[in-house]
Amino acid sequence: MVQASGHRRSTRGSKMVSWSVIAKIQEIWCEEDERKMVREFLAEFMSTYVMMVFGLGSVAHMVLNKTYGSYLGVNLGFGFGVTMGVHVAGRISGAHMNAAVTFTNCALGRVPWRKFPVHVLGQFLGSFLAAATIYSLFYTAILHFSGGELMVTGPFATAGIFATYLPDHMTLWRGFLNEEWLTRMLQLCLFTITDQENNPALPGTHALVISILVVIIRVSHGINTGYAINPSRDPPPSIFTFIAGWGKQVFSDGENWWWVPVVAPLLGASLGGIIYLVFIGSTIPREPLKLEDSVAYEDHGITVLPKMGSHEPMISPLTLISVSLANRSSVHSAPPLHESMALEHF
């Protein structure tokens, strides 16, 4: 009887713990703002994971077997990986998949700063898990190619599958300038593609156009540094390779190159955004600004799957401007944008 009574108390206690956990989860989800933050975290996590799995997988093909992989294949893998990532999370978080893009949007007032750590944490975890996935899928191929050794440099190096490394013909600071400039061009063109008041991509084509931008950057300037242009792309896989057995050389190689793909893109994206706003964005007449947290704010995104409907407000993704088609004299007859998605992207 004593044992039975103890068992009942144990069962009752476990049930109380279970219900308290469930109640806590429900309490978290009852707040709209907290629910939105969780959704955006998961969206950045999944979109970055999708982009990196396709991108790193294409690099693995190029490194491990020239018959199945190529440099062009790597560019297409990352480019179309971005497309899939945008479709995974564009309407939820904007599918930045890039900490430099998130930082720039926060610095320029397009995204609240409280979302910055949420987005970046999701991006880093997604990138780390993608590296772990590629390692698991290509484990035997990696060992076969390298003779059982996990090397960072040399003809049988495999660390480059997961992260970028400074080539022999580049110096550290030339590499820094290269990464800064490429990320500057990336952000400038992203603002161009998504500015509804300028000459944006056609409704429903933004994901594809952005992937074309990524491919163009990679095929035209990839030889110098491997074009990280994304703080969420390099450090997490480097951390994984350090844990998996490649050793501390993943950080020390190339004159301690590891920090450049973090700092240079942050600087470059910020400059690219400012350059666009000063030289292009400021010259375009716009309606009064409505902040994201305003009661009147509805959406600040880009249509991926446009639908026909009534003339509802259109939102400029560049400055979060709410523009009604009914009161714009300069707007020609065109189908309205509806069901829009946020994209201040990668």
Curated annotation (Swiss-Prot):
<dbReference type="GO" id="GO:0015250">
    <property type="term" value="F:water channel activity"/>
</dbReference>
<feature type="intramembrane region" description="Discontinuously helical">
    <location>
        <begin position="226"/>
        <end position="239"/>
    </location>
</feature>
<dbReference type="GO" id="GO:0006833">
    <property type="term" value="P:water transport"/>
</dbReference>
<feature type="transmembrane region" description="Helical; Name=6">
    <location>
        <begin position="258"/>
        <end position="279"/>
    </location>
</feature>
<feature type="topological domain" description="Cytoplasmic">
    <location>
        <begin position="1"/>
        <end position="40"/>
    </location>
</feature>
<feature type="transmembrane region" description="Helical; Name=2">
    <location>
        <begin position="72"/>
        <end position="89"/>
    </location>
</feature>
<dbReference type="GO" id="GO:0015793">
    <property type="term" value="P:glycerol transmembrane transport"/>
</dbReference>
<feature type="intramembrane region" description="Discontinuously helical">
    <location>
        <begin position="94"/>
        <end position="107"/>
    </location>
</feature>
<feature type="site" description="Selectivity filter">
    <location>
        <position position="227"/>
    </location>
</feature>
<keyword id="KW-1133">Transmembrane helix</keyword>
<feature type="topological domain" description="Extracellular">
    <location>
        <begin position="59"/>
        <end position="71"/>
    </location>
</feature>
<feature type="site" description="Selectivity filter">
    <location>
        <position position="233"/>
    </location>
</feature>
<feature type="topological domain" description="Extracellular">
    <location>
        <begin position="222"/>
        <end position="225"/>
    </location>
</feature>
<feature type="topological domain" description="Cytoplasmic">
    <location>
        <begin position="90"/>
        <end position="93"/>
    </location>
</feature>
<dbReference type="InterPro" id="IPR050363">
    <property type="entry name" value="MIP/Aquaporin"/>
</dbReference>
<comment type="similarity">
    <text>Belongs to the MIP/aquaporin (TC 1.A.8) family.</text>
</comment>
<feature type="topological domain" description="Extracellular">
    <location>
        <begin position="240"/>
        <end position="257"/>
    </location>
</feature>
<feature type="topological domain" description="Cytoplasmic">
    <location>
        <begin position="108"/>
        <end position="115"/>
    </location>
</feature>
<feature type="short sequence motif" description="NPA 2">
    <location>
        <begin position="230"/>
        <end position="232"/>
    </location>
</feature>
<keyword id="KW-0812">Transmembrane</keyword>
<dbReference type="InterPro" id="IPR023271">
    <property type="entry name" value="Aquaporin-like"/>
</dbReference>
<comment type="subunit">
    <text>Homotetramer; each monomer provides an independent glycerol/water pore.</text>
</comment>
<dbReference type="GO" id="GO:0015254">
    <property type="term" value="F:glycerol channel activity"/>
</dbReference>
<feature type="site" description="Selectivity filter">
    <location>
        <position position="78"/>
    </location>
</feature>
<keyword id="KW-0472">Membrane</keyword>
<feature type="transmembrane region" description="Helical; Name=4">
    <location>
        <begin position="175"/>
        <end position="192"/>
    </location>
</feature>
<feature type="transmembrane region" description="Helical; Name=5">
    <location>
        <begin position="205"/>
        <end position="221"/>
    </location>
</feature>
<feature type="transmembrane region" description="Helical; Name=1">
    <location>
        <begin position="41"/>
        <end position="58"/>
    </location>
</feature>
<dbReference type="GO" id="GO:0016323">
    <property type="term" value="C:basolateral plasma membrane"/>
</dbReference>
<protein>
    <recommendedName>
        <fullName>Putative aquaporin-7B</fullName>
    </recommendedName>
</protein>
<keyword id="KW-0813">Transport</keyword>
<dbReference type="GO" id="GO:0005886">
    <property type="term" value="C:plasma membrane"/>
</dbReference>
<comment type="function">
    <text>Aquaglyceroporins form homotetrameric transmembrane channels, with each monomer independently mediating glycerol and water transport across the plasma membrane along their osmotic gradient.</text>
</comment>
<feature type="short sequence motif" description="NPA 1">
    <location>
        <begin position="98"/>
        <end position="100"/>
    </location>
</feature>
<feature type="topological domain" description="Extracellular">
    <location>
        <begin position="137"/>
        <end position="174"/>
    </location>
</feature>
<dbReference type="Pfam" id="PF00230">
    <property type="entry name" value="MIP"/>
</dbReference>
<feature type="topological domain" description="Cytoplasmic">
    <location>
        <begin position="193"/>
        <end position="204"/>
    </location>
</feature>
<feature type="transmembrane region" description="Helical; Name=3">
    <location>
        <begin position="116"/>
        <end position="136"/>
    </location>
</feature>
<feature type="topological domain" description="Cytoplasmic">
    <location>
        <begin position="280"/>
        <end position="346"/>
    </location>
</feature>
<dbReference type="InterPro" id="IPR000425">
    <property type="entry name" value="MIP"/>
</dbReference>
